[in-house]
Amino acid sequence: LRWQERLAQTLFAHLPRSLAGAQRLGWVLGWLWWLASPRYRADLAGTLATAGMTNPRLHRQAIGACGVQIVEALWVWQQPWPDVLDTVREVVGWEAVEAARGRGGGLLFLTPHLGCFEITSLWAGERLPITILYRPPRQPWLAKWLTAGRARGGVTLA
């Protein structure tokens, strides 16, 4: 096994049951990754500079947030579907979706990778059939987890 797969297996085996616990773990891992990888530090600094984010406080937040995003996705993929749906606290604008469905025809959701976007499709798939267009991961070993975690409820992958 490659080291990335071994790390992912270890994370899966030891993920906290709570989303808050997973987020704390992700914050720590984001910082460890940043400390351990000169290439990642350079890439992140370049990305933030390109975005015009020069505030050191924002840099520190981004370091932790990158780890949180990765661990949140793993958490969502691993948890039972009802437990994931229970984490949704507020939905804004769903009435527009219902109105569009009432007029017939299809809908296209564009979901940016902000926050824990992995939950968005599962929540929508609970209410209507949904197909996700995605690019399979470059790491073949990751595909089994991604597929199992995303293709649940009314969600189909394409």
Name each model-derived stretch.
Residues 103-158:
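Catalytic core of membrane glycerolipid acyltransferases/transacylases, capturing the structured
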